[in-house]
Amino acid sequence: MPFKRKDLLGLRELDVHEIEHILELAVSLKEINARPIKKVPTLRGKTVIHLFYEPSTRTRTSFDIAAKRLSADTYSITTAASSMVKGETLLDTVKNLEAMKPDVFVLRHTVSGTPHRIARHTTASVINAGDGMHEHPSQALLDMMTMLEHKKKLDGLTVAILGDIAHSRVARSNIWGLRKMGAKVILCGPITLIPPEAHTMGVEVSHKLGEIIPEADVIMVLRLQKERQQQMLLPSLREYSIYYGLTAEKLKKARRNVLIMHPGPLNRGVEISPDVADGPHSVILDQVTNGVAVRMALLYLLGQK
């Protein structure tokens, strides 16, 4: 099935067949990363520009490696290195870069909706690498790829998403993607960190971690942003950890083959204990590995437009 979209802006707008197509392609491309020479000429002569206006380690590095393994030329621009520090708007930056004839922009921005706005004003393809609290589609795709590798299916799985869901673009993309693929999604966290629109998203909500652990095939732990305590959304990090931190003791109630996931970066000892993060149920590093394959698939599909 050909991928007809110019851009990849979010999972909410993709259908099941498009998601399946991306995941199948990612699986086929993953073996390139195990070769002694990890490079194919697929995107030779193509140019990918990374525009990151928010800190990133895994996503930016992963996209850069993915592009280079497909033989694309890559260039990275951050806020500090861009003309935005001189007052230039993002749209003007993109229009000037577009005049240099790139093929793909990979864009991360603090403001929700920014990739959509930029995509309307450029002929190059745009990949959303995370926009505000809105979406992070490539993260959700690599999460689903990891679940498929270990569980062999998504349809019928019960996936619990634990933590600061209200402010999480990772959670939103996973909700849209997993629900479309037939998974049951349970959100768990304090009432102050559950989005008010949760009841409209086709998910279940629980405020008691002990109730959802025995039911889950996958537990996805989200990073607790420490500024939430300063915003008075939490009494303290210690209290959050007591009630919602995932520990080996709490995991004793879990299914024997439960998967533990985390998009990173981790706050060890807050939302997840070190023995769980590094334990036998953890597939956190598998997520990182699969991130390269998923981003290769996205660049493959959009870079050849």
Curated annotation (Swiss-Prot):
Disulfide bonds: none annotated. It catalyses: carbamoyl phosphate + L-aspartate = N-carbamoyl-L-aspartate + phosphate + H(+). One of its GO terms (biological process) is 'de novo' UMP biosynthetic process. L-aspartate binds at residues 86, 169, 223. Its EC number is 2.1.3.2. It holds the Pfam family OTCace_N. It comes from the Bacteria. PROSITE patterns: CARBAMOYLTRANSFERASE. GO terms for cellular component: cytosol. Carbamoyl phosphate binds at residues 58-59, 108, 136, 139, 264-265. Keywords: Pyrimidine biosynthesis, Transferase. Pathway: Pyrimidine metabolism; UMP biosynthesis via de novo pathway; (S)-dihydroorotate from bicarbonate: step 2/3. One of its GO terms (molecular function) is aspartate carbamoyltransferase activity. Catalyzes the condensation of carbamoyl phosphate and aspartate to form carbamoyl aspartate and inorganic phosphate, the committed step in the de novo pyrimidine nucleotide biosynthesis pathway. Belongs to the aspartate/ornithine carbamoyltransferase superfamily. ATCase family. Heterododecamer (2C3:3R2) of six catalytic PyrB chains organized as two trimers (C3), and six regulatory PyrI chains organized as three dimers (R2). This is Aspartate carbamoyltransferase catalytic subunit. It comes from Syntrophobacter fumaroxidans (strain DSM 10017 / MPOB). The gene is pyrB.
